[in-house]
Amino acid sequence: MGQIVEYTSKTVTKQFFGMLGLAKRAGKTVHGTDMICEQMRAKRKPVLVFVSQNASDATRKRLFTKSNFYSIPLVEISASTEELGHLLSGGGLTAAVAIMDDGFAARLLAECK
């Protein structure tokens, strides 16, 4: 079992959403809890996982357990599931998004307060 890597809470800015949209268009994101967990088990693992502030306790626990096991930092952000869903899937609810690229992960973390 891995040790706890990182679990923090951050406030996001307008620039964060712009950078996240750019990462999505570049194909460097995976969104949705099931897809993220599947990607964590794959060879090419996410660099960073963001979870929304109003994600369910079950979703939060599942992502925390998986990210802890695979040593992937998990950051809770002040964005809602509605905001993430609108940005990433054009509507609906999205509780989490994984970043697959080091550069985008570093830049997104820099845009969080």
Where are these regions (language model features)?
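Short, compositionally biased "basic patch" segments
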Residues: M1-F17
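Long, amphipathic alpha-helical "stalk/connector" segments that mediate intersubunit docking
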Residues: G2-Y7, G27, M100, L108-A110
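Electropositive phosphate-/nucleotide-binding environments in soluble metabolic enzymes
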Residues: K10, V30, D102
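N-terminal first-folded block
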Residues: K14-V51
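Positively charged, polar, low-complexity stretches
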Residues: R25-G27, T33-E38, A58-H86
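Short connector loops at helix/strand junctions that flank enzyme active sites
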Residues: R44-K45, S67-F69, G91-G92
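Gly/Ser/Thr-rich loops at beta-strand to alpha-helix junctions
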Residues: N54-D57, F104
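Short basic, glycine-rich beta-strand/loop surfaces that mediate nucleic-acid
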Residues: S71-K113
